[in-house]
Regions:
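Short secondary-structure junctions
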Residues: 23-33, 70-73, 167-171
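An extended, acidic, His-containing surface patch that forms the Zn2+-binding/catalytic region
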Residues: 150-186, 256-259
Length: 259
């Protein structure tokens, strides 16, 4: 399945995912920009109030997808392509599909378009939490490079951070992904988790199945943790700490004014 997903254009993958979700008896909502005539997201409400999120586009041109060469070292569990693999973020899409195929769990599902360029899919759902899902405990985006990493961006909910770290992740810093738009708008905490790719956005991008599987197991644990998802984890924006500002101002005065 993973190779099939890697070879699809964003449009082909969009259609494929709509069909899969319908087969799983989800009520599927397709978000569309009628002015631009572009489809922006796929949303499917489940009975577990955790949103699993991945984006459908890659940085590589769609026309290179169909005939791309894919190499697999089965002993090392590594996949790569000289055409640009696109595991960012097809690895996240694949994880969501495997959860649906291999378990009876029914989390909320959200797939967005054009994260790598405009973030238009995330923008389109930023005001639609109640309409699409109702209650949301928190959001898991599956779009981070590497292994065992979790990123919270500008969400400063320390209790939520401790919860995610308790599953075996280590907090790192990041710049942008869809939850950077969605979570502040929804007022709900979110995290981006590693899904096993390295050297993304380059022609030497590699995908490591063991790294991916480690996160897969942890996400299953999170989806089964009813005590955790029974509450809503609030989005708390980061603020510049007042005590740090005071220290900064004091240091400036001392250096320039001798005070």
């Amino acid at each position: 399945m993973f190779r099939t997903i890697l070879r699809m254009t964003q449009t082909e993958l969009f259609d494929y995912l709509v069909d899969i979700l319908k087969e799983k008896d989800y009520n599927v909502i397709v978000g569309k920009n009628n002015i631009l005539n572009e489809r922006e997201y796929i949303a499917a409400k489940g009975n577990i109030p955790i949103v699993l999120l991945a984006h459908l586009d890659t940085v590589f041109p769609d026309e290179t997808r169909k005939n791309m060469s894919i190499y697999h070292d089965s002993e090392q569990g590594v996949i790569w392509s000289p055409n640009g693999l696109g595991a960012d973020d097809r690895a996240g899409v694949y994880m969501i599909l495997q959860i649906l195929e291999s378990t009876d769990l029914r989390p909320h599902i959200l797939f967005t378009t054009n994260e790598e360029s405009t973030g238009i899919g995330a923008e389109a759902v930023s005001s639609k939490k109640e309409e699409l899902f109702g209650k949301v405990s928190y959001v898991i985006e599956l779009d981070r490079q590497g292994y065992k990493e979790c990123v919270f961006y500008d969400c400063d909910n320390t209790q939520f951070q401790k919860l995610i770290e308790s599953y075996g992740f280590k907090t790192e810093q990041g710049t942008f992904t869809d939850i950077s738009i969605i979570c502040p708008s929804w007022g709900v905490a979110g995290v981006n988790l590693s899904v096993g790719y390295l050297w993304e956005h380059s022609y030497v991008e590699h995908f490591y199945s063991a790294m991916w599987y480690d996160t897969y197991r942890k996400v299953l644990q999170m989806l089964n943790d009813k005590d955790a998802y029974s509450k809503t984890w609030k989005y708390i924006p980061k603020e510049l700490k007042i005590d740090l500002m005071k220290k900064y101002n004091k240091d400036i005065k001392k250096e320039f004014l001798g005070k």
